[in-house]
Regions:
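Rossmann-like nucleotide/phosphate-binding core characteristic of flavoprotein oxidoreductases
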Residues: 1-5, 60, 82, 276, ...
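Hydrophobic alpha-helical scaffolding
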Residues: 56-59, 63, 137, 192, ...
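A Rossmann-like FAD-binding core segment of flavoenzymes
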Residues: 73-102, 179-266, 356, 377, ...
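FAD-site-proximal beta/loop scaffold in flavoenzymes
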Residues: 119, 141-151, 254-305, 339
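A conserved FAD-binding loop/helix module that cradles the flavin
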Residues: 298-329
Length: 410
């Protein structure tokens, strides 16, 4: 089985940007694994505009934004596998290599060894089961992302009378999309006293189409046996519990859920990656590396981003850091082999010297691949107070290890 230097899990905006950056930094032996039938990830179903303002300084749709990175990846001849589901990631403690287990219809079960892995699986929507909404389980309840895919890619309209729970960006955009497709969006309800989406989406998707936004409201009941026939909304207090007497019934045949996104953590958990209780994604250092050496994370699997431009920027950094890690580990292995050979030679020479009565043999402290090691030094500690309170900041610079460590121990 071929051994790769880098495997990128996910062919969405984060995975593509990371793979391109790694390739530009000298990693040509890499592979992208994507579970969907085409590259691009979630952007393929986001046919609205508003993408690329920061990255390309122009307004693009989701597929247009994705095609920019797909075309660049194809031009660089970066290999990829589509319709490939990654099942597991393991690490060999003796060699430090990772093994990615994946499966597809063409190749069957794959065991792919590699030196580094970039996690770019994205995020998923919070389902109904995590919301604890009472009532029956009839047809007509979808997450906003599922409805978006049905409308924009599959050509199906989920319903004609719609209520949306949650005011995340996907929910706001789907309120407009369903209206343009001929459905009647009766209300967008939000549990919090403020909207979870961007202000521009509130204006363009709700106010421009006279769709009411009900803040501090939630769904407390779902009616219907075979199909949704209506829902019951109620106002909530500061404790986020329904206030008795504020219930209102809204007839509808579809309920869309836009109640937040959570990072895809299954593979991270299997690998032993530490997760953040705040973001729900992996804990990483300043190099976007997890607690598992050689495993990096970027994009929405790390934390949910508001703009895809920020995803691409972060993923580019992850690709550069992964490339540096691969070069460093390659140098370390070469240095270790050289050090072992030197020690063997010195041991032989020491034995000869001892027999000749010439004293002890010096022990050399070897720093493998000194040009690839860096020592971080802190200096010029200052603080700023942009919000009225001091925020301590420390500047760092990197010193070449060959300059910082040049010593011999006898």
């Amino acid at each position: 089985m071929k051994q790769y230097d880098l495997i990128v899990i996910g062919g969405g905006p984060a995975g593509l940007a990371a793979a391109i950056a790694a390739h530009k930094n000298g990693v040509s032996n890499l592979l992208i694994l994507e579970r969907d039938q085409e590259l691009g990830g979630i952007l393929n179903q986001c046919i609205h505009n508003g993408f690329g303002l920061h990255t390309f300084q122009e307004e693009l749709t989701g597929p247009e934004y994705a095609s920019r990175f797909i075309d660049e990846a194809l031009a660089l001849e970066i290999p990829y596998k589509l319709s490939t589901m990654v099942l597991d990631i393991s690490t060999d403690a003796s060699t430090g290599l990772h093994c990615v287990t994946a499966m597809n219809r063409t190749d069957g079960l794959l065991q792919l060894p590699c030196r580094s892995v970039i996690l770019a699986m994205g995020c998923r929507e919070r389902p109904r089961g995590a919301l604890n909404i009472p009532g029956f389980r009839p047809a007509g309840i979808y997450t906003a992302g599922t409805a978006q895919r049905l409308v924009n890619m599959e050509g199906f309209l989920p319903g004609k009378e719609v209520v949306i729970l949650g005011s995340g960006d996907i929910g706001l955009i789907m309120a407009r999309r369903m209206t343009l497709e001929g459905a009647k969006v009766k209300a967008v309800a939000e549990l919090m006293p403020y909207s979870g989406g961007l202000q521009r989406n509130i204006v363009q998707c709700l106010e421009d189409f006279d769709i009411p936004l009900l803040l501090s409201h939630t769904v407390i009941d779902i009616q219907g046996k075979d199909r949704v026939t209506g829902i019951t909304l109620a106002q909530v207090g500061p404790d986020r519990k329904p206030i008795p007497g504020t219930e209102q019934n809204i007839p509808c045949d579809t309920l869309l859920l836009s109640c937040g996104l959570i990072p895809e953590n299954e593979l991270s958990t299997k690998l032993g990656v530490s997760l953040s209780p705040v973001t729900g994604g992996p804990l990483v250092n300043e190099s976007l590396e997890t607690n598992v050496p050689g495993v990096f994370a970027c994009g929405n699997v790390l934390h949910v981003h508001d703009l895809v431009d920020y995803v691409s920027e972060e993923a580019g950094r992850a690709g550069k850091f992964a490339a540096e890690y691969i070069r460093q580990t390659a140098g370390d292995r070469a240095g270790t082999a050289s050090a072992e050979q030197n020690l063997t030679t010195q041991a032989d020479s020491g034995a000869s010297s001892a027999s000749a009565g010439q004293g002890s043999t010096p022990l050399l402290r070897t720093v493998p691949s000194a040009s690839r090691l860096f020592h971080r030094a802190a200096s010029d500690t200052r603080f700023r107070s942009p919000f009225g309170c001091p925020i301590w900041r420390t500047r760092f610079w990197f010193v070449s290890a060959s300059e910082a460590y040049s010593q011999t121990q006898y």
